[in-house]
Amino acid sequence: MLLRYLFILFIIIPIKAFALIEVDITRGNLNPLPVAVSPLSIDNKSKENFKKILKQEDLGSEISIVVENNLRQSGLFNPLDKNAFLQEPDVANLKPRFEDWNLIKAQALVTGKVTFVDEKLRVEFRLWDVLAGKEMMALAFTTVPSNWRRVGHIITDKVYERLTGEKGYFDTRIIYVSEEGPKTKRIKKLAIMDQDGFNNKYLTLGNELVLTPRFSPTNQMVTYLSYFRNLPRVYLLDIETGMQEVVGDFPGMTFAPRFSPDGKKIIMSFAKDGNSDIYTMDLENRIVERITNHPSIDTSPSYSPDGKKITFNSDRSGYQQIYVMDSNGKNVKRISFGNGLYGTPVWSPRGDLIAFTKLHKGKFYIGVMRTDGTGERLLTENFYQEAPSWSPNGRVLIFYRETKTNSKGEGFSAKLWSIDLTGYNEKMVETETDASDPSWSSLLSN
């Protein structure tokens, strides 16, 4: 799990020519790029060693499956059926017969090799432009064997970046609230998993209600809201050590905690004397600063990536809308003016958009708008859905959605969903239990 155990060793072969392949991710992709992901070749001795350590029959094939599934889930790529491949993995990795790959309509090809070296996992991979008959990229990784799924995610990130021109989002994690039990008596725990739903781990026991977990910029810490003895408090949790602490001792109710981009502060909403305003706390000296001072309800603050601006929602106009202000609370400006109520605004890591939840005529929408309020687009609608969180490249949103219950209160569920920025590729994210309040980490490796 620790990042220091995975290293990119070297670039084997530099890119010598511009490839013909180009994937446009700014529009809904109705024609995903056909890509062949060949099983990574592996010698018999390495196969036996990994089988003993990891209980995996063929680690080369397993890593290629991770890459294939990631590419398919992105909606931008169409991994081809391996049964149609005409060339063996070990041969394809050395020198592909491009005419064979052209026959099955592949435009890009991923090949590679897995070996067991000095008790470590070594993975080499290559990306080929089939149409141009050229190698586009070649990299090698060495890590502990248990990190094999992460290697698959990192390979996907490299392929995604080379073919789209933008960073990927596959070597990431999602923290969320796991939910079990009847709707009126839910057991809620903090849980964390890889972005594809694997390696799920519970971080709390479910003895207290937990809400709104959010990652720190380093991905090591999480801030969240928990009810202890029926009092809501903001907590910090170290994911690696399991240590947690209360962030201050506020006499009122605290809500919606989130880290500043530099990780030095937590911004939150604090209710006192019937009024809710936005505050920050310096995590080093624990000094609390009041950012808004208004008789309305101000909540759900989120920083811009450079830390200079804050977006939040407030009912100061009479009903719930989205506002933007300087990080010191000055120059408050309303930016949402459409019909309905707006909430849970969150700034894109790219800095260009704000995602939000909207309630209008009994339906909930997940949408985006520019930071000045123009260009509002509603991406998806449902009976109930909220709490969008951005992928680190700002191209995908994850949120949660609830189902209706029948007259007996049966049939309730809460699930995580994702959708890309164009409004396409909407899909459910698999979790072990019901799930809500997702937060997407930044990339674990660059």
Curated annotation (Swiss-Prot):
It is found in: Periplasm. InterPro entries: 6-blade_b-propeller_TolB-like, PD40, Tol-Pal_TolB, TolB_N. HAMAP family: TolB. This is Tol-Pal system protein TolB. It comes from the Bacteria. Belongs to the TolB family. NCBIfam families: propeller_TolB (TIGR02800). The keyword Signal applies. Keywords: Cell cycle, Cell division, Periplasm, Signal. SUPFAM superfamilies: TolB, N-terminal domain, Tricorn protease N-terminal domain. It comes from Pelagibacter ubique (strain HTCC1062). The Tol-Pal system is composed of five core proteins: the inner membrane proteins TolA, TolQ and TolR, the periplasmic protein TolB and the outer membrane protein Pal. They form a network linking the inner and outer membranes and the peptidoglycan layer. The lineage of its organism: Bacteria, Pseudomonadati, Pseudomonadota, Alphaproteobacteria, Candidatus Pelagibacterales. GO terms for cellular component: periplasmic space.
